[in-house]
């Protein structure tokens, strides 16, 4: 269930962030990405606590990305990491480059 749930969310050309709404790092990642000119429908925040499988989802994220913490940010099919990784990419200018590469920017 967790594997199918995660895999069906992660798609080429899309930005997906797995979050918990109470997590301050998740909120920060949401703020950063929401301010960018990402095309309608290509940015999705997935609240893993809205399922009854939070632990299983985090276990699968661990298997997939090497970390079970949230946020887990995917640009296309690539996991770029968490909030600090997102901030680093933003500061270096690499974030916009990666978003352009997958065709997610307006």
Swiss-Prot record:
GO terms for cellular component: cytosol; extracellular exosome; nucleus. The modification N-acetylalanine is found at residue 2. InterPro entries: GLR_AS (IPR011767), GLRX1 (IPR047185), Glutaredoxin (IPR002109), Glutaredoxin_euk/vir (IPR011899), Glutaredoxin_subgr (IPR014025), Thioredoxin-like_sf (IPR036249). The keyword Acetylation applies. Its main location: cytoplasm. It comes from the Eukaryota. The modification N6-succinyllysine is found at residue 9. GO terms for biological process: nucleobase-containing small molecule interconversion; positive regulation of membrane potential. CDD domains: GRX_GRXh_1_2_like (cd03419). It is found in: Cytoplasm. Residues 3-106 form the Glutaredoxin domain. Keywords: Acetylation, Cytoplasm, Disulfide bond, Electron transport, Redox-active center, Transport. The keyword Nucleotide-binding does not apply. Disulfide bonds join 23-26, 79-83. GO terms for molecular function: glutathione disulfide oxidoreductase activity; sodium channel regulator activity. Has a glutathione-disulfide oxidoreductase activity in the presence of NADPH and glutathione reductase. Reduces low molecular weight disulfides and proteins. Belongs to the glutaredoxin family. This is Glutaredoxin-1. The lineage of its organism: Eukaryota, Metazoa, Chordata, Craniata, Vertebrata.
């Amino acid at each position: 269930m967790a594997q199918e749930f995660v895999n069906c969310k992660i798609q080429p050309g899309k930005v997906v962030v797995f979050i918990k709404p109470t997590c301050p790092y998740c909120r920060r990642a949401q703020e950063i990405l929401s301010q960018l000119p990402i095309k309608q429908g290509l940015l999705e925040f997935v609240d893993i606590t809205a399922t009854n499988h939070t632990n299983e989802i985090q276990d699968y994220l661990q298997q997939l990305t090497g970390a079970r913490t949230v946020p887990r940010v995917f640009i296309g099919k690539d996991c770029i990491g968490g909030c600090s990784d997102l901030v680093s990419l933003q500061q270096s200018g690499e974030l916009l480059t990666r978003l352009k590469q997958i065709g997610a920017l307006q």
